[in-house]
Amino acid sequence: MSKKVTETVEQLVTPILDEMGLELVDIEYVKEGKNWFLRVFIDSDDGVDIEQCGAVSEKLSEKLDEVDPIPHNYFLEVSSPGAERPLKKAKDFAKAIGKNVYIKTYEPIEGEKQFEGELTAFDGTTVTLLVKDRGRQKTVAIPYEKVASARLAVIFF
């Protein structure tokens, strides 16, 4: 049901975002404790502010009331993806070149399934990271289809 809900919400929110010059980053439909949450993460090249989030929430809420894809009560949250935004699409990886990222893979690459480092290149098929390994820097090439999840990483020194 979760996948069906997120697909329906994506179809409903995309025209709203296109009209406002915004982009969809991610949709989450999750149960936390007794409550269900529908979270829609939006962004633009200039970032998003609370007024834009509120406007999207209002318009999307109207559409959700019309279509009613969720049979029970839930909380709708519309926000920016934050500093550690997920990288979901190829264009997200391309935009993140030069930034620090955290990647989990479906299977081990060079004996590891988790990587954190600078995204140095992305050609559509391979994600290239510069990572620290025992005090030295090394390059790791990760096949794009083996990426289970990825996000920007905030590094604290």
UniProtKB/Swiss-Prot annotation:
Its keywords, alphabetically, are: Cytoplasm, Ribosome biogenesis
Descriptive protein name: Ribosome maturation factor RimP
Query: According to its UniProt record, which protein family does this protein belong to?
Result: Belongs to the RimP family.
Looking up CDD domains in the UniProt record yields:
YlxS_C
Where is it located?
A: Cytoplasm
Gene3D superfamilies per the UniProt record, alphabetical? Ribosome maturation factor RimP, C-terminal domain (2.30.30.180), RimP-like superfamily, N-terminal (3.30.300.70)
Q: What's a BP term from Gene Ontology annotated to this protein?
A: translation
Gene Ontology CC annotation, any one: cytosol
- Organism equals Geobacillus kaustophilus (strain HTA426)
Q: What does this protein do?
A: Required for maturation of 30S ribosomal subunits.
Q: Name one Pfam family in it.
A: RimP_N
